[in-house]
């Protein structure tokens, strides 16, 4: 039986074009097709997982898996970029190079304020990088000792790095997959804690000096999704929004088994951590996806976020096709930085993700839609007709209309399109990229991402960010998110709001017939 509901815009549909700061243009001097304009991407060649996210002395540091000699995966280095606002990035020289012990896989960075490692030389606290060494020769020989943990330190705010003379700091002899250390300071016991991905679970280690580690526990062999190898853990303590209560959240990526195409994806667990191990607050089989799109992987949280904020960045690609996407000179981008909040909902504790308020500075032109719209003869409103970079905020109250779905459709003059919407019959948000342009480089790429709506609020909220080759959708204040990349042959410059039947829009304030107003804001450089 078809659901009947009314679409009522309670506020205004706002579509905003972005204005870019000169430093961002400088980061990407070329204007190659699909080059992101408000997401971080490397100047050239290969990038994957974000590593070592840390806020220190007024700068956000983004390190990342990087191969500087080709646009496909190769011997891993740590690339490096810094930002003062998480909007504009400056790429710095490579931070860590492979050496005789192996390639430099993923890891994390902490601020050693107490100089527990004894590596300080100078006035500022050292930054300590804990990372995985990967020995290719041992891997070829099927050795169980091909991955182990190393350390490096910096005494000049991350500009130069020196590796610890007696690496490795944590050896391995029993696991093929033994990687991606996530380290933080556990103040109740004045010690460091490491969360390490070990095949089908994570292990916990502790240390007083960041150099000698002891195993304390493990988690996950029978918990959550196991469609692929576990990677890139991020364990955080976070306040329950609006309360004084605190919970622990373990963010955990998996190499296969994602909700849309079975590819790489990221799940999370809510529970407790006692300094030795993690205890899941939900049933073993319960799976919470961080993102229902195909392209948000290896997501990790900044160490030392200002004002105790938990800010997350993910790699905006998927291992099913990352090496095949049709870009030139460079490959991959990062998601927008997102602030995490933990809320106690009617369905239990859930992570919410919100785009940072700092992105408002990129807004330029504004279009308002208000009043009754889309009556009997029309089911489409053209919102934007000449902008390739857009932010869309939509609020809809579901009551009595005949339309079973509504969507925002981005398109170009050659008929390619990307559709982002909500289906009331199935209660799913979705991104449909099957007609978005170049989709035949990998059979799994032509997909429709579906995200079940978990909120029972009568108001649908969708906050959408459209770059030239990516879309991020924050639904219901970030309770549900979807992230996808796409590759049109020409930029999408037209945005339509579409209902599949008689779609009614009505503002809270007036009963006037539909008006579309354009407002233009000159923003400061």
Name what the model sees in each region.
Residues 1-2, 6, 16, 136, ...:
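Generic N-terminal leader/processing signal
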Residues 1-29:
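Bacterial Sec-dependent N-terminal signal peptides
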Residues 242-244, 272-525:
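Beta-rich accessory regions
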Residues 27-181, 185-228, 239-292, 314-370, ...:
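Beta-rich carbohydrate-recognition and catalytic domains
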Residues 18-20, 138, 486:
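Alpha-helical transmembrane segments and their juxtamembrane interfaces
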């Amino acid at each position: 039986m078809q659901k009947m509901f009314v679409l009522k815009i309670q506020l205004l549909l706002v579509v905003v074009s972005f204005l870019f700061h000169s430093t961002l243009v400088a980061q990407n001097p070329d204007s190659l097709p699909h080059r992101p304009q408000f997401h971080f991407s490397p100047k050239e060649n290969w990038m994957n997982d974000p590593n070592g996210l840390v806020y220190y002395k007024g700068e956000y540091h983004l390190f990342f898996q990087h191969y500087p000699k080709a646009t496909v995966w190769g011997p891993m280095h740590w690339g490096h970029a810094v930002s003062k606002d998480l909007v504009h990035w400056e790429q710095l020289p490579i931070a860590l190079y492979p050496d005789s012990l192996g390639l430099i896989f993923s890891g994390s960075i902490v601020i050693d304020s107490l100089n527990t490692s004894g590596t300080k030389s100078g006035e500022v606290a050292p930054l300590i990088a804990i990372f995985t060494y990967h020995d290719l020769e041992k891997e070829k020989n099927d050795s169980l000792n091909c991955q182990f943990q190393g350390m490096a330190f910096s005494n000049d705010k991350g500009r130069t790095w020196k590796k610890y003379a007696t690496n490795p700091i944590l050896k391995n002899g029993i696991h093929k997959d033994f990687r991606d250390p996530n380290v933080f300071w556990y103040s109740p016991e004045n010690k460091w804690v490491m969360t390490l991905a070990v095949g089908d679970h994570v292990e916990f280690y502790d240390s007083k000096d960041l150099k000698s580690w002891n195993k304390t526990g493990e988690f996950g062999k029978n918990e959550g999704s196991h469609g692929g190898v576990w990677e890139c853990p991020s364990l955080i303590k976070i306040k329950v929004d609006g309360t004084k209560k605190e919970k622990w959240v373990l963010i955990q990526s998996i190499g296969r088994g994602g909700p849309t195409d079975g590819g790489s994806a990221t799940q999370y667990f809510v529970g407790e951590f006692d300094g030795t191990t993690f205890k899941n607050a939900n049933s073993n089989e319960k799976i919470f996806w961080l993102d229902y799109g195909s392209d948000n992987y290896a997501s990790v949280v900044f160490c030392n976020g200002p004002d105790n904020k938990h800010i997350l960045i993910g790699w905006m690609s998927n291992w099913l096709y990352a090496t095949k996407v049709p870009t030139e000179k460079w490959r991959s981008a990062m998601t927008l930085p997102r602030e995490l909040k933990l809320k106690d909902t009617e369905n239990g504790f859930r992570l919410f993700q919100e785009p940072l308020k700092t992105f408002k500075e990129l807004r330029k032109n504004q279009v308002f839609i208000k009043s009754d719209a889309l009556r009997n003869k029309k089911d489409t409103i053209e919102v934007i007709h000449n902008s390739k970079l857009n932010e869309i905020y939509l609020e809809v109250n579901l009551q009595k209309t005949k339309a079973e779905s509504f969507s925002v459709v981005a398109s170009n003059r050659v008929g390619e399109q990307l559709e982002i919407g909500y289906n009331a019959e199935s209660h799913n948000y979705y991104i449909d990229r099957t007609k978005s342009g170049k989709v035949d480089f990998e059979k799994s790429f032509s997909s429709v991402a579906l995200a079940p709506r978990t909120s029972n609020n009568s108001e649908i909220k969708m906050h959408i960010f459209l770059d030239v080759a990516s879309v991020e959708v924050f639904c219901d204040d970030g309770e549900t998110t979807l992230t996808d990349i796409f590759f049109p042959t020409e930029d999408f410059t037209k945005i339509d709001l579409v209902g599949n039947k008689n779609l009614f829009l009505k503002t809270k304030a007036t009963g006037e017939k539909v008006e579309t107003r354009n407002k233009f804001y000159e923003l400061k450089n």
